[in-house]
Amino acid sequence: MEHFQTISPEQAYQHWQNKSAIMVDIRDPQSFRTGHACGAFHLTNDTLNELMLQANFEQPVMVMCYHGHSSQSAAQYLLNIGFETVYSINGGFEAWRRDYPHAVDSLHNPA
């Protein structure tokens, strides 16, 4: 895959349920602490090496941001550094939280 693909929150949820993809969240630390998809890896410049050491580059990666815009650049970057299949989630965390509130780990709703 040379370019990332965009997927709907529904498609991302199916991957999440099946544990068939890694979920990464690129939002700022405060936003991530306040709430994120259950099991999401908080991807920052400081945690990129950790992801690369832990990840299977053949396993799909789903990238989540606030609304689905910033995740596109991050998705392309992950492809460029060797991940084989990368998705950007349309609507980002806002769509995920709206559609799947039970799949959110937050200060008010711990997983």
From Swiss-Prot:
CDD domains: GlpE_ST (cd01444). This is Thiosulfate sulfurtransferase GlpE. HAMAP family: Thiosulf_sulfurtr. PANTHER family: FAD-DEPENDENT OXIDOREDUCTASE (PTHR43031), THIOSULFATE SULFURTRANSFERASE GLPE (PTHR43031:SF6). It catalyses: thiosulfate + hydrogen cyanide = thiocyanate + sulfite + 2 H(+); thiosulfate + [thioredoxin]-dithiol = [thioredoxin]-disulfide + hydrogen sulfide + sulfite + 2 H(+). Transferase that catalyzes the transfer of sulfur from thiosulfate to thiophilic acceptors such as cyanide or dithiols. May function in a CysM-independent thiosulfate assimilation pathway by catalyzing the conversion of thiosulfate to sulfite, which can then be used for L-cysteine biosynthesis. It comes from the Bacteria. NCBIfam families: PRK00162.1 (NF001195). Keywords: Cytoplasm, Transferase. It is found in: Cytoplasm. The keyword Cytoplasm applies. One of its GO terms (molecular function) is thiosulfate-cyanide sulfurtransferase activity.
